[in-house]
Amino acid sequence: MSQFNNTNIIENTPINKMHQKKSNILDIFTLDNIRTNHSSDKVFFKITSDKPLSTDKLGQHFDNTYHTGLNICSIPFETKGSCVDGGIYFTDKDNILKFLFYGIYLRKVDLPLDDPGFIMVKDPDSCASSVKWRASRVILGNRLNLRDISTFKYLMSLGVDINVDNDKPLRWAASRGYYGLVKFLLDNGANVHAYDDEAVQLASRNGYLNVVKILVEYGANVNANNDYAIQMACKYGYNEIVRFLVFNGANPMANRYYPIEIATEFGNKLIVRFLLHQDKSMVYKSYAMDIAVRNENWDLLNVLLLD
């Protein structure tokens, strides 16, 4: 137990408070922050991407570049504040899948407890629904690809709920077009209707027809959120997704004709023509023509006039 006495592990306390009784340091150490080497159910993980990215983009915090083995924070460690740049962030196995949008690689985190430069705090923004820590240095294991089903099987073997946080893994996989993973999650209890059927909306918005199809096969509601799925497919020009959604019950006149409005706005001629055949009323056609004139899209206007 003597190895703990020189290890700076604190929970939202200034570094100068570390000069207290050794028993108190031990209490902080054993009661909350570190059970990873003493309890089989406390396992830490981190999600990383291919390259360092700032928090306003998809990726990990700030400018740390991560590799297998010992990683040391490139700037001075900060003991106060939340989501600050002075520290390497990670969480435990029960929370790791809540941070999927930070990258595509899962890494096991071990703590260099014997390293005198090791400092660790629990982030003050941590709550019952989302817990994270940061440390001055950590030991990262090999990368496991979160796009691979085998990685999720590994997490399941540790008792991780792979449908955590309103089925975030399903919504994440659908938004990125990971068909095999989407099917695996659905076959293992994921709720296709989670978050107001967000999975099918995200897959439609990002153009993944095969994912849209399997979600609908498993019962996804294509009319959810005021037919958001078809609206986004019309906006981004995904003709086949628009057709599939309409043939499976999506409303081409949803939200006061928004599908044809947005398709016309973005000049998606094939979609505009398809939508016009769903409602041959002059009101619908005139609406599209007005938008084409406003945008001076004479090519599309010609299509509308001749259709």
Curated annotation (Swiss-Prot):
It holds the Pfam family Ank_2. Keywords: ANK repeat, Repeat. InterPro entries: Ankyrin_rpt, Ankyrin_rpt-contain_sf. SUPFAM superfamilies: Ankyrin repeat. ANK repeats lie at residues 135-164, 165-194, 196-224, 226-254, 256-284, 286-307. The keyword Repeat applies. PROSITE patterns: ANK_REP_REGION, ANK_REPEAT. It comes from the Viruses. This is Putative ankyrin repeat protein R229.
